[in-house]
Each structure stands twice: as C-alpha cells, then as structure tokens.
Amino acid sequence: MEQTFYQFLMTYRGKLEKDDNSELAEWAFRNHNFPKHSNTYDEISNYLEWNSPFPSATVTFDSLWNEYEWKKAAY
C-alpha cells in the first residue's frame, strides 16, 4: 500500500532542533482537519493555502512534496 503524504510528513516529527519541516509535521499532527488520507498535491496545497500555520508553510510543503514524490518513484 502506498504511503500517504501525511505518513511521510510524520517522519519529520519530534526533532530536537526545530525547522520548518518539523514545524509543519507537528502542526499537521495536531490539526484534526488536515487531509491525512490524501495523496493529491492540489488537495493538500489548497488546504494549506487556507489554513497556513506559518508564513513559509506552503514553500515548505512544496519542498517536502518534491521529496515525497521522489521517494515514491524510488519504490
């Protein structure tokens, strides 16, 4: 079964040194409305545009999405 973006994002939780990736992961974990079962860029991107937790969240998401897609292609 294919890993969702949310599952991929959760690998960034719990870092001792916080960065934008871990901040987005912590926010998604605590946000009950985050589209946890989505693998669609547009759905998650639109959600973040309306509910952005910090100013660079959409840029962080784009970077993480590229990594997510790259890892999916590798498997």
Curated annotation (Swiss-Prot):
Annotated S-S bridges: none
* Protein name stated in the entry: UPF0346 protein OB1736
InterPro entries recorded: UPF0346 (IPR010673), YozE_SAM-like (IPR023089), YozE_SAM-like_sf (IPR036806)
User: Record's Gene3D superfamilies?
Assistant: YozE SAM-like (1.10.150.260)
Describe the family membership recorded for this protein in Swiss-Prot or TrEMBL.
Belongs to the UPF0346 family.
Q: Which domain of life is it from?
A: Bacteria
Which organism is the protein's source? Oceanobacillus iheyensis (strain DSM 14371 / CIP 107618 / JCM 11309 / KCTC 3954 / HTE831)
Under Pfam families, the record lists:
YozE_SAM_like (PF06855)
Q: Which NCBIfam families match?
A: PRK13672.1
